[in-house]
Each structure stands twice: as C-alpha cells, then as structure tokens.
Amino acid sequence: MASSLHKHLLSAARHHLKETKRMSMMVALNLAAEILAVDCGLKPCFLYDYTTSGVQQICSYLKELQNLGLIVGHLHILNVEETILIINVTKAVSYLETLLHSQDLHLIDVSNYLSQPELVSSNQVPQIHAQLAELLGHIKPYQSGQPTSVSVGGIQSPEWNLCTMFGFLLQFPSTYWFDTQKGFENCLSFTPLRLFTVQANCSRIGHQSVQIYSFTVPECVYQATQVHLEDWSKSLKQAFNEQNYFTDLEIITNTAQVCCVY
C-alpha cells in the first residue's frame, strides 16, 4: 500500500514540478509530507523551495494530491515577489489576528548597526501591525474557499520587511526583524544561535523523520524568550494531538555559530 502511494507521489511531483534533474523519491515524499503538515493544521504555511516551479505548476501538483485523497482542506498559493508560500488560510488568519491584538510580538532585532541581537523596541510595533494588517487583508478573503480546493494570489513589491512577514506566516515563535531603511544586512554573523528543529513521522504516507519546523534564536536573547518558546511548544503539542497524519513528535535543540547569515 505504502509502496504504491510512494510511486504515485513521485510520479505526481515529476510530472507537475519543474526541475533541472529528476526528483528523487525521498524529496518527493518530504515535499508531500510538508504540505500535509499545512493541510492538517500543524503549521499555517510552507515556503516552497524545492524546485523552480511556477504558481500554476504547483497548483496542478496540489490538485493531484487532492485527487489522491491526501489533501482535504482548502489551500492557498501566495506569490510574493517570486517567493511562493502554500497556506492553510484558516490557521494563518487566526494566528495573524492574534498577533494584531498583541503588543508583544516576540521580535528579535538583528539590524546591522547593533553589536548583538536584542528584542525589538515597542515603538516599532505600530509599523509592524500595519504590515500585518495588509497581509491579513490579502489572505482573509480566501478563507471562504471550499474544502479540497486550491486558490492562487499574488502581492507585488510590498513595502514590508519580508523576513519578518514570512516568519509570522510560518508561525515561528520568535521572528527576526531589521530596520530596512538602514540596510538589509544583519548582526547575526558569529553570533551563537540556538537551533530548534521539530520533526515527526508522517504515518499518512509512511514517511519517516519529516522536518516540520526549523528556526534559530540567538543565545543572547534566549532567556528573555524562553517562556514564550515553552508556550509555543505546548501549543504545537496540542495541535499535534488534534491530527492523525503525523506521529512521534520530536523537538530538538542544538547550539550553532555561523560565519555569515543572510
């Protein structure tokens, strides 16, 4: 049964998605599992970075997964300056609305002029709320999409900090921000980082060790964000218990230091 499904998933990915070389079985299964994590509500969004496929190719692929009976909810494909995100609109809208009513966004300022990362000042919150409201205003109309359907939308050249907006859409517990008016570089080089990786087995398609989340928090602000990280982990575990696509959830923490972060 699993072997037959694996072949169907590989065939669907190779048929619909553009790639310079033939996609392997492992990559095809990882891709399908990441989309299933969005569909079942484990996370609100998936940033598509597997191939150079365009919106219509990805749309065709998602419809093929629906034909296979794997996707049961409505998914939205959002194209932001050629970056493609696959969104569970209901979950994303709920999370963005929560952020709009919060004064503590758990943002980490990594502007290049800082000697080390620090929590974002409260006087930046109104500007970030305005960008969140614009993003919410774009995706909320798609909330009425029918189950087992795919919608498509695009945003051209938004005056947003895309790093921050993508972090919100991906529901990272702590998201990076930097002052775009003073440049797009950051102060993360040689900064000790705590790397969080969330993985689980996708029993729905018989695939092991699927990465669901991966994000970093600078060690210098870890203590200040620890309570929120624990709350985020509890919320994730609750969402995990409410679905039946994935089993054996693991949250893994490591410490790393990189020479340069873009």
From Swiss-Prot:
InterPro entries: DUF4504 (IPR027850). Pfam families: DUF4504. It comes from the Eukaryota. PANTHER family: UPF0739 PROTEIN C1ORF74. Belongs to the UPF0739 family. This is UPF0739 protein C1orf74 homolog.
